[in-house]
Amino acid sequence: MILDSLETKEKILKEFLQTCAFDGWSKEALVKAAANCGIGENFLPLIFENGLLDLAEFYFESQNEKSAELLGSLEGKKIRDKISLSLYARFAVEKENKIALQRLINFYLNPKNFTSFEMGPRPAFQALQVCYNIADFIWKNIGDQSTDFNYYTKRATLGKIIFRAVSVFLKDGDVNNFIDVEIEKVMKFEKFKSKAKNLLAKNLLAKKTWDKKTFCEIFLNEKGSPRSPKEFVKNLPFFRLFS
C-alpha cells in the first residue's frame, strides 16, 4: 500500500466519515479511521500533512467531483440555469454525509482553535476558502473563461451564496429554493447595475463639454433659481432609477 496514494486517502476518508459522527471532526476520529484501515497514527502526517485540514480539503475536492458526475451535461442551457443546477447537485451529494458536514462546520467554528498552537485561525480561514474553491470549481465546470476582474467577483458572489446555503441545508430547509431566491437577487442587481451604468453614460459621459445649458439643467430649477439639495440629489441619474 502506497501511503500517500489516492486510494489510501479515499479509504481513510470513508472510515472517517463514519467515526466522526460520534467523535466529531477530530484527531481521535482520524486516528480511529486510519487504524481501521491498518495504518498507524505515526504514518498519518505522510498521508495528510496538515491533519484534519488536509482531510477536509480532500473531502470537498472529492465531493466536487461527485457533483460534476451527478450533474452530467449542461450543453445548451443558460448560464443562470447552469449555476442553479450545479448548486443543486453540489448539495445533493452532501445529503448522505450531512452529519459529517455538521461536524466539520463545528470544527471550523470552534473558538478553541484560536487558542490552539496547532490550529490557530486556519480552520476559520479554510471555511471561507472552501466556499470560494467550490464556486471556482462550478464556474470552471460550466466553461467560464473570464480572466479580468469578473473572474474574482463571479467566484466571490457565488461563494457567498454557498456559504449561506450551507446553514439552510444543515437545518433541513429547502436549499434549492434558497438558491433560486439568492440567484434571482443577484440577477436583479446585475440588471440594475447595467441600467445605472447606461443611464450615467447617457446623461453624463455623452456630454463632452459642460456648456451653460448643461449647467442650468443640473443646478437650476424651472424658475432659474438654484435647486435645493433635495431637488439636486433627486435629479441625479442614479436616483432616477428609484422613481
Tell me what each language-model feature is.
Residues 6, 70-107:
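Hydrophobic alpha-helical connector segments
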Residues 115-144, 155-159:
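Amphipathic alpha-helical packing segments from all-alpha helical-bundle domains
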Residues 172-243:
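C-terminal peripheral helix-coil segments that are non-catalytic and often amphipathic
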